[in-house]
Regions:
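Phosphate/pyrophosphate-binding catalytic cores of soluble transferases and nucleic-acid-acting enzymes
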Residues: 1-312
Length: 312
């Protein structure tokens, strides 16, 4: 059975489409989001609400303690167990999310960076980043993998550390690692549907509205509750978009509106990076929203794509 995947940048309606397809196909949703895995962070990560789920079971949401360094390798293993369980019950898995790296790791099934499931290499590299600084780590990447370094910004901590992680565990550059893993048959066959806005201004408005709704739903209270629970400020989860800015506001380092504006800006920048990543994948079938979302058109497009691949 092919997995149905709904991908796209933040704020483009993936949750809605994933639920609609799961209802139509008799399926269950598996979240593919690097931040929704954490407990107690439902508002800032835009985890689906009970109302949005419409009774459809959702997996890989709120499964990890935010103190943990939850790696992509661990996600791939945990999500695969969910997928296999859904398949064993004769149900259709619907993968929903915008984290392209996590999606690729789940579908490929041949590990990530050699399978650093315990996060040992990543934890060591994170510690070195804190002690030595980003410039030193970036210089190290330039020495061992100049090709990858040439495509990254000095401040792109996540991808710099990922490239170093791959090298130190496998002895290979990212290009070499990717070339080798592409030769291995994927764990799952899939049909991929992408959602995005045709006009950039429409995407901007959708993201801004999404952030406003998060704040209205209690984002700042959620962050305060995490702090009150004893969650350290420097854990990876608290550096996510929305949480870092909320911390600045709660600490008196930024005005409330300044924090909200910064969340909107970073969210738009993140959406742009998501699109750049996902558009590299020629297997994704894209549906572009006009200024007004016409839901039946999107559902008809998606249904036609699925029927083309024998999914019904």
């Amino acid at each position: 059975m092919k997995l149905v995947c709904v991908v796209g940048p933040t704020g483009c309606g993936k949750t809605w489409l994933g639920v609609e397809l799961a209802k139509m196909l008799g399926g269950e949703v598996v979240s593919c989001d690097s931040m929704q895995v954490y407990r107690g962070m439902a508002i800032g990560t835009a985890a689906p609400t009970a109302e949005e789920m419409q009774g459809i079971p959702h997996h890989m949401v709120g499964v990890a303690d935010p103190r943990e360094n939850y790696s992509v390798a661990r996600y791939a293993d945990d999500a695969a167990k969910c997928v296999d369980d859904i398949l064993s019950r004769g149900k259709q898995p619907v993968i929903v999310g915008g984290t392209g790296l996590y999606l690729n790791a789940l579908l490929a099934g041949h590990g990530f960076a050699g399978g650093d499931k315990d996060g040992r290499y990543r934890a060591e590299l994170e510690s070195r980043w804190d002690k030595e600084g980003g410039e030193a780590m970036f210089a190290e990447l330039r020495r061992i993998d100049p090709e990858t370094a040439g495509n990254l910004h000095l401040n792109d901590k996540k991808r710099i550390l990922r490239a170093l992680e791959v090298y130190y565990e496998t002895g290979k550059t990212m290009a070499q690692h990717n070339a080798e893993t592409k030769l291995i048959p994927p764990r799952y066959d899939s049909v991929r549907i992408g959602l995005a806005y045709e006009d950039r201004d429409d995407m901007k408005r959708a993201i801004d509205l999404r952030v406003d709704k998060m704040v209205e739903a209690g984002l700042f209270d959620e962050v305060r509750a995490l702090l009150d629970s004893g969650l350290p400020r420097d854990v990876t989860a608290m550096q996510a978009i929305g949480y870092k800015e909320a911390l600045a506001y709660l600490d008196g380092e930024a005005a409330r509106e300044e924090a909200i504006d910064e969340i909107k800006l970073r969210s738009r920048q993140y959406a742009k990076r998501q699109l750049t990543w996902l558009r590299r994948d020629p297997s994704i079938h894209w549906f572009y929203w006009k200024k007004t979302r016409i839901l039946p058109d999107c559902l008809a497009f998606s249904t036609e794509i699925l029927h083309t691949y024998g999914v019904s």
